[in-house]
Design a protein with these regions (language model features):
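Acetyl-CoA-dependent GNAT
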Residues: 2-59
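Conserved active-site alpha-helix within GNAT-family acetyltransferase domains
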Residues: 104-121
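Conserved catalytic-core motifs of GNAT/GCN5-like acyltransferases
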Residues: 100, 118-135
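Conserved GNAT acetyl-CoA-binding A-motif
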Residues: 89-100
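Conserved acetyl-CoA-binding loop-helix of GNAT-fold acetyltransferases
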Residues: 68, 74-88, 110-114
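Short hydrophobic/aromatic beta-strand or adjacent loop that forms the aromatic wall/cage
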Residues: 32-34, 136-143
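Conserved G/P- and acidic residue-centered "switch" motifs that form tight phosphate/ATP-binding loops
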Residues: 76, 93, 105
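Conserved acetyl-CoA binding element of GNAT-fold acetyltransferases
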Residues: 59-70
């Protein structure tokens, strides 16, 4: 199910595999890769993950999550990590990905645009959605990314 990830690097960053998560249907969780984002000298500067497949839960949670540590923000590292993950998703046969963020999270919205996503909608979360129930969130920006023609590091 899981593939080799050694190719997930470019001149600026590399993704170091930290953990693999199997699917958990009872919790509506998909199989996932979890990575540390490292800069060109190997210093950890953040993290990201790729959740495989498509479902209602992933429509709202997204296929990719990312976080860049404060001192390293503003350099497009999250967008560059997303672009590397696009190739891994393609190798899993995925033709598109969804990335979501809160409507007031302007840095994340800019990351989605930088990585080539198109805003599909600002969706209201279903009443029973975990992000609504547990975190009090009500809406998500839904960005769609076509994987046709995407190559690692592009």
């Amino acid at each position: 199910m899981f593939l080799d990830t050694e190719f997930l690097k470019n001149e600026e960053i590399s993704l170091r595999l930290v953990e693999l998560s199997e699917a958990d249907p009872a919790r509506k969780w998909s199989p996932a890769y979890h990575f540390a984002i490292c800069d060109s000298v190997g210093r950890e500067i953040g993290g990201c993950n790729l959740r495989l497949g498509h479902s209602e839960a992933l429509y709202y949670a997204g296929n990719i999550g990312y976080k860049i540590d404060e001192p390293y923000r503003g350099r497009h590292y999250a967008g560059k990590a997303c672009r590397l993950l696009f190739e891994l998703a393609r190798r899993h046969g995925m033709e598109y990905l969804i990335i979501t963020c809160n409507p007031d999270n302007w840095p994340s919205r800019k990351t989605c645009e930088y990585a080539g996503g198109g805003l599909v909608e600002i969706a209201e979360l279903p009443e029973d959605n975990d992000m609504r129930v547990e975190d009090g969130e009500t809406h998500k920006c839904i960005y769609r990314f076509s994987l046709r023609g995407t190559r690692a590091g592009s």
